Amino acid sequence: MFDTSAGVFKAVLFSTEAPQAVQNFTTLAQQGFYNGLTVTRVEKDFVVEAGQSADGRGTTIWNGNRFSAETTDKLHHYSGALCAAADASGDCASVFYVMETLPGSSSVTQELIDQMNAAGWRADVVSAYQTAGGAPYLDYTDTVFGQVYEGMDVVDAIAQTAVDENQKPTEAITIHLSLIHI
């Protein structure tokens, strides 16, 4: 559960498809790493990002080793996807983001749909992007390790917040994470 100063949202984690990302995220959450951190980047109709520690680098890993992005054709960057950000080398650490790209936004254009179809993307994936929105160009680059199932309106509200020239919210939005096992 993500208890933010803007409200609460909940996500399910995909430990089978993204075991390293889930282990890193849950261990850091259990250690209290994310508690009190702030949302560090907001791009309206794209992402809400957090997980950078006080050093501003977002390089904390529970066991000291960065991990490679975990990609699969089973998980995609649909709106509400909880993702581990990969750096230029393809490695991930503590930074995570939630996709906020909504259906009908400019990210999933008819031209992109046509390109996906021409490239042989599965019809169900293309249809899901049309229905849910998202960022298909991030598939196979960053790790999807969860999906928001409740409180997407909170994520959408955070995505509407005023930001500075670095896309950081002008008013701090703090995070407190609680892990609920079901």
What spans do the regions from the language model cover?
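Cyclophilin-like peptidyl-prolyl cis-trans isomerases
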Residues: 1-180
